[in-house]
């Protein structure tokens, strides 16, 4: 196991690719897509192209999308949950590849980031090569599906920002949007937790006709959002608005299960 040679040991249990949620598999697909382009650009000494590719990955795909969505899993799920373990596994894969890809461009920064975990000056990031991409990571159909999900999500997040500007909500977790899509749009979200993807406390995906005053984004014809606020109280642990929370210091069912499980393991 390469991770053991890099000082990671058994810090966490890895989640196998076939048991990961679709969002985690999409991140690995993006790494596979980028890897082939970076190898080609490295051969051609196109380091500006590599920088542009990685800037888009870090800014758009990771920071503004994946990390934003998965913070709740990392902070609030049970430590040994499959979803949280899958997230940590993917974040490790991102780290290992980013440090290698950035090494020729940001030599000192890449080394500092690498040594923060390896803590072995003789094991330099500059002695590494690009890790091979495992079979199965590249999945064009999955990539196309998540491109569609992100387009619908853009309408929802824009609607939430408008509601925030109007003073209807202070944070997205106060919302429970009803998202009107066509049949193809509904299929995109099959099996997914739409509220988690939108960072709201609740959400509905429906193929019903959207009301005339539903929020729309010009150029995106397959989605419209009817704004609604979430019912219930604010969970003191995860901050979601849930119907089972009835007191100021109450917590939701998910958090109650996690806390009780943690107490058992003490």
Language-model-derived ranges and their functions:
Residues 235, 252-255:
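Short cysteine-rich clusters marking metal-coordination/redox-active sites
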Residues 197-199, 203:
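A glycine-rich helix N-cap at a beta->alpha junction
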Residues 1-12, 266:
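Short, small-residue-biased leader/transition segments that mark boundaries at the very start
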């Amino acid at each position: 196991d390469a991770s053991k040679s890099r000082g990671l040991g058994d810090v966490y249990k890895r989640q196998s690719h076939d048991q990961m949620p679709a969002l985690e598999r999409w991140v690995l697909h993006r790494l596979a897509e980028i890897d082939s382009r970076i190898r080609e650009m490295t051969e051609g000494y196109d380091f500006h192209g590599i920088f542009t590719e990685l800037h888009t990955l870090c800014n758009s795909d990771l920071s503004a999308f994946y990390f934003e969505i998965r913070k709740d899993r990392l902070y609030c799920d049970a430590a040994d949950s499959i979803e949280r373990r899958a997230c940590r596994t993917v974040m490790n894969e991102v780290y290992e590849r980013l440090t290698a890809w950035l090494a020729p461009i940001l030599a000192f920064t890449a080394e500092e980031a690498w040594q923060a975990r390896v803590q072995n000056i003789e094991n330099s990031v500059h002695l590494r090569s690009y890790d091979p991409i495992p079979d199965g990571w590249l999945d064009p159909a999955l990539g196309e599906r998540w491109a569609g999900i992100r387009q619908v999500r853009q309408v929802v997040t824009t609607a939430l920002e408008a509601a925030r500007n109007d003073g209807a909500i202070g944070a997205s977790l106060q919302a429970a949007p009803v998202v009107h899509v066509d049949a193809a749009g509904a299929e995109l979200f099959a099996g997914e937790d739409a509220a988690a993807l939108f960072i709201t406390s609740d959400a509905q995906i429906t193929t019903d006709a959207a009301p005339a005053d539903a929020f729309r984004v010009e150029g995106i014809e397959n989605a419209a959002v009817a704004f609604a606020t979430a019912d219930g109280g604010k969970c003191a642990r995860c901050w979601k608005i849930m119907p089972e929370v009835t007191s100021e210091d109450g917590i939701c069912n998910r958090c109650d299960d996690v806390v009780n499980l943690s107490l058992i393991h003490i």
